Amino acid sequence: FVSFFSNNNLQFYSFMSLQSVVACRSVKDFSDPVLDLIERTYTESFPEVERRDFSLVRNLVRDESRFIVYALSKEDRYVGFITGWLFDGYTYVEHFAIDPAARNGGIGAEAMKQFLVFCGTPVVLEVEMPTDEMSKRRIGFYERLGFKLDNQVYHQPPYREGGEWLEMRLMTYGDVDLEYSFEQVKNCLHKNVYGVKDGLTR
């Protein structure tokens, strides 16, 4: 494979295997045209209660240095995206989706496997409760990549004012022991990702 990666800047890197090539480009300009493609995938892949308005995503690209967006492509064709946050000691993956037109080809697993290799930090993400076949499959997808499901009760704050808190679960990759750091990680996500004021977390 060929790659360029800086853990501080997360600028650009390409993931290669014998079967596929997935390129990941860091999006730094809130007016970058690829954000139009990402917006489409974002709104198609996640229900409204699990995402913010995309205009706010663009604002984060412009204003928040800890917020990261990657456009995924294969053979110069857009196939999906990853968004996340850089925190002390770990990276939080907020949203990860493959465009519907590019699914079922192993691109998602390939991209995430290589992202984990090059990320250089432990990773935390949220998943829906395993209450149906789709949510169970999603958890299984991450478990096959080496993630561990934490069974402590976690609530995702609402993205929109007046919305409901959603019971979810956290999954971790690498050296993140939620048995000891659950409250710290939860409070960090609630405060920085969702804007929950101190003392109002669940």
What are the roles of these predicted feature ranges?
Residues F46-K74:
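Active-site rim helix/loop that mediates acceptor-substrate recognition in acyltransferases
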Residues C119-T131:
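Conserved GNAT acetyl-CoA-binding A-motif
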Residues S17-L56, M168, Y180-L200:
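Short amphipathic alpha-helix that is part of the acyltransferase structural core
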Residues M129-Q152:
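Conserved active-site alpha-helix within GNAT-family acetyltransferase domains
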Residues A71, R77-W85, Y90-A97:
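Conserved beta-strand in the GNAT
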Residues L149-F182:
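A contiguous, mid-protein "functional segment" used to position or interact
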Residues I98, N104-V117:
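Conserved acetyl-CoA-binding loop-helix of GNAT-fold acetyltransferases
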